[in-house]
């Protein structure tokens, strides 16, 4: 069961959190795909290709590190996803009010 320092996560919260993580991940990948398609259509030189490669390498590292659902960081991950617009505050209603408040506060930092 997922936990924060304040309160344990219920099974329903845990399942909903995983579902929202998957949804946010897919949103990010969809956006990345659109960006890459647009950039790829503009490639005219080999330097453009290497820039796209560097961009993709950096994005892969960023994305691989972002979607971490370990108990110790899950609140922070949701705050980051909220800050980046990959999840909306309304999508966090499956969480207890104290957890929602903490995520929203962290997203404002």
From Swiss-Prot:
Outcome of mutating residue 50 to L: About 25% conversion of OCP-R to OCP-O
Protein name (record): Fluorescence recovery protein
Principal subcellular localisation of the protein: membrane
Annotated knockout phenotype: Decreased fluorescence recovery after non-photochemical quenching (NPQ).
GO cellular component, one term: plasma membrane-derived thylakoid membrane
Subcellular location per the Swiss-Prot or TrEMBL entry: Cellular thylakoid membrane
Species per Swiss-Prot/TrEMBL record: Synechocystis sp. (strain ATCC 27184 / PCC 6803 / Kazusa)
Keywords: Membrane, Thylakoid
Impact reported for residue 60 to K/L: Almost no conversion of OCP-R to OCP-O
Bilayer topology: Peripheral membrane protein
Subunit structure: Probably a dimer, interacts with the C-terminal domain of OCP-R.
Physiological role: Destabilizes orange carotenoid protein-R form (OCP-R), the FRP-OCP interaction accelerates the OCP-R to OCP-O conversion. Increases fluorescence recovery following non-photochemical quenching (NPQ) by OCP, most probably by destabilizing OCP-R binding to the phycobilisome core.
Gene expressing this chain: frp
